[in-house]
Amino acid sequence: HGALCMSVSGQCGLSAVIGSRSANRGRCAQACRLPFSAKGAKNVCALSLKDLCLVPHLAELAQDGVASLKIEGRCKRPEYVAAAVTALVQARAGEEPDLDTLRAVFSRSGFTDGYYTGKRQQMFGTRQKEDVLQAKEVLPHLAQLYQKPTPQIALTMDVRVQTGEPAALTLRDA
């Protein structure tokens, strides 16, 4: 789940040329999200893909042997990650995933599954005013989840270190 790269991820030359930041080094400037003008079309975001969302296809992916998933969101808010994880957990449990909250937290006018399903007509999108308003509405509720004190769990740790043998570390919760 998360952002799709118009280029081959990490290989974007546009980021380096326009943004002076190498996507090859994890510093993508997201130049593809900018509006461009070409052939009479002005300020068109022709390279801006919607974020990928395969949550509705989770059971099918599991049947195909997919054992782990990645949420693309290293620069996203904790609320976004929480909404994505919640939707994935719900789908995995056979429940109806809360895609409305996930979409409200952040989307570019919805999501796409076009590369997976082959339905590529609605793959492009940008953040619209409605997307921003939805986020402002849902974020305070989700932020409350992070205002609770972090629970502390007592751990017992055993370390065994002997010359010529691999070190062994064992942790147990109380």
Task: Describe every region a protein language model picked out.
Residues 1-174:
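Surface-exposed amphipathic alpha-helical tracts and adjacent flexible/coil segments at the periphery
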